[in-house]
Amino acid sequence: MKRLQKRLHGHIVVCGFGLSGSVAVRELLESGVDPNSIIVIDQQQSALESATALGVAGLLGDPSREDILQQAAIRVAKAVIVTVSDDQTAILVTLSIRSIAPETKIVVRIQEHVFQRQLRQAGADVIVSSTKIGGLLLADAVESRYIVPFVNDLLSARGRVTLLERPAAPREVGRATNTVTGMLIVGLVHDGRMFSFYEDAPRTIEEGDVLIVMESTRATRTEEA
């Protein structure tokens, strides 16, 4: 573990390797994240065996315990994904993480939306309500045939279309959002405020803006190559 800690910096910690945790790890790997930069914490040895079979590191223990989090070098982690079995445990884990790592990004999966406020107070940066998202997609599927497959494609690293969040490039600064070619800008964040293409007029991109863009994965892979 000491050898592992020495190379951990800017890594991703996944607390809980159940269904959601395993999907998250696989998706990170599919998107190109180095397996050596992922560590999974779980209390079940069988879960860790499944995780390490994917090439990531495993740490046996309770993710709400500060000593376990310290072993995962949580203070210098890039982000922590919390996908534990119940929402109240998620709150406890989030509190423990935030007490050690005030700057680390914390992403939490919850099952009941009513716990969102408590998780915000505990220090969660991003909260994903799996039941709410699932319910919305189920409702959409009643009246449509193609929306759910499109959303699945959009969210998957293996999909044909990808949704990216990135800083505005120098060549884009000064241009209107509807004149940038090669991608679809669906959102722009300026000074912390989100502007969406479907509810706001085209905006001029400024230095420091964050763009949310939709583009083909083929184009993305070509740029990376």
Locate predicted features.
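Cytosolic regulatory regions of ion transport systems
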Residues: M1-A225
